[in-house]
Amino acid sequence: MQQLKTDYLVVGAGAMGMAFTDVLLTESDAKLIIVDKHHQPGGHWNDAYPFVRLHQPSAFYGVKSKQLGENTIDTTGLNKGLYELATNEEVCSYFDQVMQRQFLPSGRVQYFPSCEYQGNGEFSSLLSKEKYKVSFEKEVDSTYMNVVVPSKRPPPFTLSGNVLSAPLNELSALGQKFEHFNVVGAGKTAIDAVLFLLRNEVDPDRISWIMPRDSWILDRAQIQPTLKSIGTALANQVVPGSESKNIDEFFSKVSDAGGLLRIDENVKPTMYRCSTVTKAELIQLKRIKKIIYYLMVKMPSITFGTPPFNFLNGPGSVSYTHLT
């Protein structure tokens, strides 16, 4: 077992671990060891579906010392007129550049990819039999939120009937094999699934959107790296929110002021997952008329009829026993 020594032992090389390390390198003379189970920095972005993008402008993401993206405004697509949204490949490449061109050349960072942390300063390689023991001053667990994308776990429900369950990573390769698509969840991943299908000319009638309840959605036009956007957010969110006496009144006032969006104007959302869309994307989402609400229970079981279905599950999926 190799013996190592450092000031900070950072577990995880995702956005949090990288941002923390960046600040320590900039504002102190500390030495750090980073341990991560992935083969390169980027955390769960390494496991994400190929067509995923940030839901926020690239300028808001990454580490303090290096800008992500080119700070450009999109001129085409559903994000037209707003600041660019980094792709999956761009995010992973960005974090890899930060590691290879900034962290490691500093001489103060040791990086151990493809390693599993066991706790108490011990970790081992996932590719060899090498084991390590670290003596450290402070341990920083940047994996505390335990983000697990659908491709790294089984669906949280059982299926019966002629049904295929697949994470979004497989969606682009499914082709015309299925008569119908059921998208499960009401968060960012589910929105991405629906928009991907519509963008690829799947008839809205071939899509069912299964969700626990409706969700409040942020307007991306009001989350931009500009002074105008800050002013709009103050007027549409902060001011009406500060005047609210309870949660229901908060969402009602902010929505009336234009600070929040909803898919169905006739249904009052009861969930908030911080999902972000443009109004052009919202128009597309409203094309889905088959929205099915389900009850949440501990022992899920789903039955569909004889037509072949494809089941896409996102991180917002919740297990359920029947549809209502």
PLM feature spans:
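Conserved small/polar residues in nucleotide/adenosyl-binding loops
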Residues: 321-324
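N-terminal Rossmann-like FAD-binding beta1-loop-alpha1 element of flavoenzymes
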Residues: 8-30, 193-197
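Glycine-rich dinucleotide-binding loop and its adjacent helix/turn
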Residues: 81, 87-94, 141-201, 207
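Feature captures the FAD/FMN-dependent oxidoreductase FAD-binding
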Residues: 77-148, 284-287, 298-305
